[in-house]
Amino acid sequence: YAECSPSTVSRELARNKTKTGKYSPKVAQEISEERKERFRKERKFTKEMKVLVIKYISEEQWSVEQIVGYCRKNGIPIVGKTTIYKFIHQDKENGGNLYKHTRHQLKHRSRALYTCKKKVEDKKSIEERPEVVSQKTEFGHWEIDLIVGAGNKGAILTLVEMTTKMLFMRKLKEGKKAKSLADELIDMTLPYKNYIKTITADNGNEFSDFKRIEKNLNLQFFFAHPYSSWERGLSEHTNGLVRQYIPKNTDFKDITDKEIREYQYKINNRPRKVLDFEKPKDLFYQKVI
């Protein structure tokens, strides 16, 4: 070890000690060879793995992180995220379109700017919301938002549960009109009204009929502070997932209710890192069935 630094020697001794705490060059060499062999086995990107990756990305639109996390959690052989990203980049360079099925298409996107919204009268502030909601440990607390179509025409309602990340979506027949939105929300959630304790929204005038929502669904409706999208971070993130299927500047006239249900299913069927790679739909229906 004459040419090695003291720190290198220390690491070598620490990594390759025997069970008795002593260092043996022979044992160290055997451990090193075993470690290399294990690394080679783990890193080999087999044909079966590639088929699995292609399926999850192209058919289910799972992220690389979701694929790796789900496979490791369920004992399915898989390589690391870096290897999969290299595979996607290589596919793109070879004229493939696998990257088009990833959420950001290998590009970093900047956050959208938020426009000023009208004041909603007699609303309950998020500051009045029970503390347990912010802890995100109790089932039954939801965030609501709208995704707006091209030219500010048409709207899709999104409602997501905080603990399971279960998403419900609906294309609104009359866009952002408050009465129509309330009608659609009540109709969509009526079968699950016993599992909705609170809903938190932004200050958009489209939620001004919240009192009727509270009465019909027997819940409490709260509003975040103006220009504070981080108070509804789950909605913001979930809308980003929806945008993978419905990009900005999409004309909503071309989107069918069947397609909305299909996108909803796919998002709820993705394993999520925040859920320890469980799927939202599995966790949600464990609670309600």
Question: Where are the model-predicted features located?
Answer:
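Basic, flexible linker segments flanking DNA-binding modules
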Residues: 25-34, 77-134
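Mobile genetic element proteins and their domesticated derivatives, centered on retroelements
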Residues: 9-12, 53, 67, 84, ...
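Short, basic alpha-helical/linker "hinge" immediately adjacent to a nucleic-acid-recognition surface
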Residues: 1-60, 65, 70, 76
